[in-house]
Amino acid sequence: MNPASPDFSFETAALAGGALHVAGVDEVGRGPLAGPVTAAAVIMDPGNIPPGLNDSKRLTGAVRERLHDWLLSHARVAIAHASVDEIDSLNILRASHLAMERAVAELSPDHALIDGNMIPRNLGCGAQAIVKGDARSLSIAAASIVAKVTRDRIMVDLAQQYPGYGWERNAGYPTKTHLQALLDFGVTPVHRRSFGPVHNILCQGKSVTS
């Protein structure tokens, strides 16, 4: 049985409750050892939903790219990040919430639908946390696509600056290639020093790549 596709029911309920602008919010990049965490907030027009819109994890790279470009042209979209320094100083959960707060602040919606089971504390609007929201809400699905494509592109650019870690393929996640490269080449300025595998390399006295 195919999993159900996301729909507009959460947005419709919020609009019926008096909200004028409802944003779906998602983030990507909690698990990688390198790079920022990226969040997107998207306000969709209920009368203009692109076919095939779904959780980014259910889509091919080509479809994600196409939908990303469509959303930037046809929806209200905000993208924000929390840096590696912020991740290391705050912790990854708080940093991911900070990125979501920044994205929401750019759109100033009346209500936000947040992927997951926690609501960031400084959203500035009413909000609902939806577990597996990227597979249930079209607005969150849209945000998941924008966030993933944006961050993947950032990691491709960083891979040009720091070759050998495979970020153009692994997006900074701890793949075998990435972990071996840490041993071979050391830690870069865009690695998250608070994350175990990176911290362990530093404790071994591995030189930091400039």
Where are these regions (language model features)?
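RNase H-like, Mg2+-dependent phosphodiesterase core
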Residues: 1-210
